């Protein structure tokens, strides 16, 4: 009799627990995605078995959620073959409570969807003129540079005020930095490393394009910085009194080009393929010949084994309109970009 009286209560408790379990499972059944694509489908799976509230609690603008509780095979087919999961529900429908991070703001686009756009705070910028960026490009003002940094170049900074120049004339570098003209005849502001450790072995010796032996790459960079213009690397090892390129051993797939002007050779990269671009500007080379581009000039130099340098942009029969380029340093080396020599 006692067991009969308690049976209905136990059954009710069991049903209650079962209902609660089903409710909790239905609340958890769903998939969280990192973005909603232009095709309206969810892409980049973040986590499975999450409720919409849990998924959207991240605060990310692009986070989306799907309600379907499907197996791994279906998820795989959605991601690989179908361009994402269907029935995608974005977490954010408006800009309310959207945190886009520093330098960005949430705005509704033409499709009435919230989007984070670059909107740097330019209110404290005092210099309104053009600036030269670390990428060697001129920006119409610092605010334009900040927008470019926000979009695709997080390391972009202002080098100096004014347009990017070909010489250090009228370049005022901030702080303790110094103006240096690199091998491509562009002015950069760098910080000179005045202390270089003594080389551990003779393998660190480098021969500069000035015919001077430097103890290490650090010593070459230091000399370049203090000089204010690119010295450039001729070849690895101590400088030798070479009579021709036959006396110089180049490494790293480089080829020796002879500079008849100073009677020295330098190792240069000669594997560059010139792109078929109509936008390239012709150059007048040191042999007084006009080449379709600087790349074409380098190609001719590598073919002949004789060093060629740019005298000025444009045809040799024309006078360069850029007065700054007329003052370019003659001892340039097109084989080594600033990143390989001027790593401050």
From Swiss-Prot:
The keyword Manganese belongs to this UniProt entry's keyword annotation: no
TB domain span: 30-103
Subcellular compartments: Secreted; Nucleus, Nucleolus
Stretches assigned to the Follistatin-like domain: 94-117, 167-190, 244-268
Residues carrying a glycan: 124, 288
GO cellular component: cytoplasm; extracellular region; extracellular space; nucleolus
Superkingdom of origin: Eukaryota
Expression triggers: By glucose deprivation.
Disulphide bond pairs: 32-55, 42-88, 56-91, 95-106, 100-116, 118-150, 122-143, 132-164, 168-179, 173-189, 192-225, 196-218, 207-239, 245-256, 250-267, 270-302, 274-295, 284-316
Tissue expression remark: Isoform 1 is the predominant isoform in serum but is undetectable in follicular fluid. In the embryo, strong expression is seen in the palatal epithelia, including the medial edge epithelial and midline epithelial seam of the palatal shelves. Less pronounced expression is also seen throughout the palatal shelf and tongue mesenchyme.
Effect recorded for residue 33 to A: More than 90% loss of binding to activin A/INHBA and FSH secretion inhibition
Domain Kazal-like: 112-166, 186-241, 264-318
Listed result of changing residue 163 to A: Complete loss of binding to activin A/INHBA
GO biological process: ameloblast differentiation; BMP signaling pathway; cell differentiation; female gonad development; gamete generation; hair follicle morphogenesis; hematopoietic progenitor cell differentiation; keratinocyte proliferation
Example GO molecular function: heparan sulfate proteoglycan binding
UniProt keyword annotations, A-Z: Disulfide bond, Glycoprotein, Nucleus, Repeat, Secreted, Signal
Compositionally biased spans, kind Acidic residues: 321-333
Spans annotated as Disordered: 314-344
Stretch forming the signal peptide: 1-29
Keyword Glycoprotein: yes
InterPro entries xref list: Fol_N (IPR003645), Follistatin/Osteonectin_EGF (IPR015369), Kazal_dom (IPR002350), Kazal_dom_sf (IPR036058), Prot_Inhib_GrowthFact_Antg (IPR050653), TB_dom (IPR017878), TB_dom_sf (IPR036773)
Function summary: Multifunctional regulatory protein whose primary function is to antagonize members of the transforming growth factor beta (TGF-beta) superfamily including activin, myostatin, GDF11 or bone morphogenetic proteins (BMPs). Mechanistically, binds to these ligands in the extracellular space, blocking their type II receptor-binding site to inhibit downstream signaling. Plays an essential role in muscle fiber formation and growth both by preventing the repressive effects of myostatin and through SMAD3/AKT/mTOR signaling independently of myostatin.
Subunit structure: Interacts with GDF11. Interacts with activin A/INHBA. Interacts with MYOSTATIN/MSTN.
Protein's recorded name: Follistatin
Classification of source organism: Eukaryota, Metazoa, Chordata, Craniata, Vertebrata
